[in-house]
Amino acid sequence: MLKLLDVHHIAVIASDYERSKAFYCDVLGFTLNNEVYREARQSWKGDLSLNGRYTIELFSFPHPPARVSRPEACGLRHLAFAVADIEQAVASLEQAGVSCEPVRIDPETQQRFTFFSDPDGLPLELYEI
C-alpha cells in the first residue's frame, strides 16, 4: 500500500485572480507566500499558506470553463476549514459580505458546520472543532 504522508496542497483555478486572492487572503486569512505571472500561459500562480503551512495553489487562466454543478458534480466537492468558534467565523464572513448557509450539526460527530462559497462558487465549509 502507498504510504501518503499528508495532503501537500490544493489547487484552485480562479476566473478573476485578484478578486480570489483578496478573498482567500483578506477574508479567510491566508498569506500570499509567492506569486508569479507566467507569460506563456497568460496565467497567475499564487502560493497561499494558512498558519505557516502551504495549503492552496491559486491559479488564473484566460476564460476557464465554469464549474459544472454545485455540489454533486464528480470530482472535488468542497474544501473544509477547521474553526474554533463557528459563530464568530460566520459573523466575520458576513461582515465581509459573504453569505453562509444556516449552521447545522453533524449527526455523526455532533460538531457544528456551515457552507459558503468562494468568488467562483467553489463550495467551502467551516467545521467547528
Spell out what each predicted region is.
Residues 58, 69-73:
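Helix-adjacent hinge/juxtasegments
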